[in-house]
Amino acid sequence: MPIIEQVGAREILDSRGNPTVEVEVALIDGTFARAAVPSGASTGEHEAVELRDGGDRYGGKGVKKAVEAVLDEIGPAVIGLNADDQRLVDQALVDLDGTPDKSRLGGNSILGVSLAVAKAASESAELPLFRYIGGPNAHILPVPMMNILNGGAHADTGVDIQEFMVAPIGAPSFSEALRWGAEVYHALKAVLKKAGLSTGLGDEGGFAPDVASTTAALDLISQAIEAAGFKPGVDVALALDAAANEFHADGSYTFEGTPRTAAQMTEFYAGLLGSYPVVSIEDPLYENDWDGWAALTAEIGDRVQIVGDDVFVTNPERLEEGIDRGVANALLVKVNQIGTLTETLDAVALAHHSGYRTMISHRSGETEDTIIADLAVAVGSGQIKTGAPARSERVAKYNQLLRIEEALGDAARYAGDLAFPRFVADPK
């Protein structure tokens, strides 16, 4: 049996130069694995709480307390447990913390242990991680939702929409989808240069030009798709992460310099659908605006994927409430929002059972850890969001998916346009 023998932890840096937690787990059979925990820039108020040190060190963002929690309390509690019983291990972590938001021991310390245990168990079983988590039928490669133009909290510009993504829905394989996305990314750089706009990069590797409006950004990306030799909406589609929490205050959305209601924002998004091949819109409204979300879903949810991130925070309880209220039709999956692998898998299972799509996601503060690539294939999400095809912490996930596709061989299937059943390309 793969019994947990040792648990270690350390403070490392993420892609934004901020500290994060790395956990190492050793099993009695000699197996060893490590996992690093990501961190977000725009976070939902209902997420699992990160344990940070405060004070002057690292501007208060140190994680020595979280590391100590692993070494002094969490590690001793899981040593002796069977690593291949993930639910048992994760329940022990949740019970040990004893709070609904993991604020006592920290979601970052708990998640690090949860993921490291899963990795160690897969190594002990001599199985690839995607196969260990997903079982013998895991074979779907996700559409890479590439954030090639950054705004909002990911860039120091006046663009309110946080992420403008390209989705290579027409590609025949993941490897070709990655190539298509990379070629559009490089074409966008040339388009921006020609327009006299900045080609500086945001947190997630996308360009961060200070463009005048959402439609101006979409026009630039559409030009880049065509310049790369592809057809917008047929080969490569568009997707948005509005991250509306960032421009909502006091019941109003201040968007592109104008105060707007939820109904007016819905009208704006509906207008985009009539003009651009948008397959997915994430967090179009404020996380606690349940009524606005329900109305928006009823209005445009039959034409586009509406993804709940901050509104659901990968939490099965909030997702269940959203399903009951008719809110969104897809779930964004971030392992550090809920804090354990088991709870993440439970949220995905609930979404799929309820007819919701899922999109596995990175955070803006990432590491070289590639577990979300394996997770996307394991659960058959058909979609992954892990930044631009640039910056090694983003590319690491794409490269892992290339390895998985190669390992699967003829059994590999690329999700492509089947991942977005609500979208119909303009026949023109």
Curated annotation (Swiss-Prot):
The EC number(s) this enzyme carries: 4.2.1.11
Metal-binding recorded as keyword: yes
Predominant subcellular localization, coarse grouping: cytoplasm
Transmembrane domains' residue ranges: none
Pathway involvement of the protein, from the record: Carbohydrate degradation; glycolysis; pyruvate from D-glyceraldehyde 3-phosphate: step 4/5
Gene3D superfamilies in UniProt: Enolase-like C-terminal domain, Enolase-like, N-terminal domain
Subcellular location: Cytoplasm; Secreted; Cell surface
An example Gene Ontology CC term for this record: extracellular region
Sorted UniProt keywords: Cytoplasm, Glycolysis, Lyase, Magnesium, Metal-binding, Secreted
Bound cofactor: record note: Binds a second Mg(2+) ion via substrate during catalysis.
CDD domains: enolase
Keyword Magnesium: yes
InterPro entries referenced in this protein's UniProt entry, alphabetically: Enolase, Enolase-like_C_sf, Enolase-like_N, Enolase_C, Enolase_CS, Enolase_N
Binding site for (2R)-2-phosphoglycerate: 162, 334, 363-364, 385
Reaction it catalyzes: (2R)-2-phosphoglycerate = phosphoenolpyruvate + H2O
NCBIfam families attached to this UniProt entry: eno (TIGR01060)
Family as reported in the entry's similarity comment: Belongs to the enolase family.
Role summary: Catalyzes the reversible conversion of 2-phosphoglycerate (2-PG) into phosphoenolpyruvate (PEP). It is essential for the degradation of carbohydrates via glycolysis.
Record-given protein name: Enolase
Protein's organism: Mycobacterium ulcerans (strain Agy99)
Organism taxonomic ancestry: Bacteria, Bacillati, Actinomycetota, Actinomycetes, Mycobacteriales
